[in-house]
UniProtKB/Swiss-Prot annotation:
Membrane-spanning intervals of the chain: 18-38, 66-86, 111-131, 249-269, 302-322
Enzyme class: transferase
Gene it is expressed from: lgt
Membrane topology: Multi-pass membrane protein
Pfam family, one: LGT
Keyword set, alphabetical order: Cell inner membrane, Cell membrane, Membrane, Transferase, Transmembrane, Transmembrane helix
EC number(s) per entry: 2.5.1.145
Family under the similarity heading: Belongs to the Lgt family.
Protein name as annotated: Phosphatidylglycerol--prolipoprotein diacylglyceryl transferase
HAMAP family in the record: Lgt
Organism (species): Treponema pallidum (strain Nichols)
Binding, a 1,2-diacyl-sn-glycero-3-phospho-(1'-sn-glycerol): 159
């Protein structure tokens, strides 16, 4: 078989048949823990004191308080943004109390908070961190830079959580690392009667049984692509960029640009939400399950373009401010 079958022993629940403890939630804990450890490491090396506008030392309580505000901002922002941008039936607009309701409306079973948006989480983190630094008289940009260098490695585990949930998978592919994901909804399977489906299945070594109505084709494991590029690679870039930082805000702007660039291109491998489809497309009939044109642009890619523009704009503005400030101080 020229594809990989998703491991049958992987389950969303840490304890089988006990839905309250899931790998996805545990990966969030791992992600925040790694970010916290890397943040503390930089503080101990004096990297925050060096760029801070106050001489008051950073305490353990300061870091914990900052992380508490930031994490709350991430969770609230990610959930609210997801329900307001990615849900088109306006259910949460009519009944906003359901945004944080963890039970199924149909069965009453515990399902957790399904739907968390990265872009909303980023906005929430900036708001939460900004409120904390403002109320404590700290430099927001200095703290944001340290957080930016700490975040991507933890983010890696968030995407691994998506993989363990077998969600946010990519478009169909015939490359050897294509993966056949379990529990794919019927809407994401393909009619066995279609000649191209049978030909595609034969090409990847899938035997279509006689009488089968639908075929589950292999897809890009886009969660792993994102974990590697938006997590590990971006973290390496930012961790090294700490040495060439010349002004506050440089690292957080670099993070925003870097994430936007990586995510924009990986979106071409990831399948867009079926109910949203493409925001822009050269042809109105482009299927979301197959890459056909670079001009097929998803909602996530539009948000990434906005991130890139905001990050570059921030770099330009902060660099110009730093140069003017340096000239002013030199004249004093």
């Amino acid at each position: 078989m020229l594809s990989i079958v998703y491991p049958s022993w992987i389950r969303p629940e840490i304890i089988p048949s006990f839905p309250y403890f899931r790998w996805y939630g545990f990966m969030y804990v791992v992600a925040f823990s790694i970010a916290y450890i890397l943040f503390r490491y930089q503080v101990r090396r004096g990297e925050l004191d060096k760029w801070s506008r106050v001489s008051e030392p950073v305490t353990q309580d300061d870091i914990m308080s900052f992380f508490t505000w930031t994490i709350l901002g991430i969770l609230i922002g990610a959930r609210v943004f997801s329900t307001m941008v990615y849900e088109v039936d306006l259910l949460y607009m009519r009944k906003p109390w359901l945004i944080f309701w963890p039970f199924s409306l149909q069965t009453g079973e515990w399902v957790g908070l399904r739907g968390m948006s990265y872009h909303g989480g980023l906005i929430g983190a900036l708001v939460g961190g900004g409120l904390w630094t403002q109320s404590h008289g700290r430099s927001f940009l200095a703290w944001a830079d340290v957080a930016a260098a700490s975040t991507p490695l933890g983010y890696t585990f968030g995407r691994i959580g998506n993989f363990l949930n077998a969600e946010l998978y990519g478009r169909i592919t015939d490359i050897p690392i294509g993966m056949i994901f379990p529990n794919v909804p019927l809407s994401d399977m393909f009619p066995a009667s279609e000649p191209w489906v049978r030909e595609f299945a034969q090409r990847v070594g899938i035997h279509v049984q006689e009488g089968a109505r639908l075929v589950n084709l292999p897809r890009h494991p886009s969660q792993i692509y994102e974990a590697f590029f938006e997590g590990i690679v971006l973290w390496c870039i930012l961790w090294c960029a700490r040495r060439v930082k010349t002004y506050n805000g440089f690292l957080v702007c670099l993070y925003v640009v870097g994430y936007g660039v990586f995510r924009f291109f990986i979106e071409y491998f990831r399948q867009p939400d079926a109910h949203l489809g493409y925001r822009f497309s050269a042809t109105q009939s482009s299927p979301i399950y197959l890459f056909q044109s670079w001009s097929d642009v998803s909602t996530g890619q539009i948000l990434c373009v906005l991130m890139i523009l905001a990050g570059l704009g921030g770099m330009f503005a902060l660099s110009a401010y730093h140069k003017r400030d340096s000239v002013r101080k030199a004249r004093v």
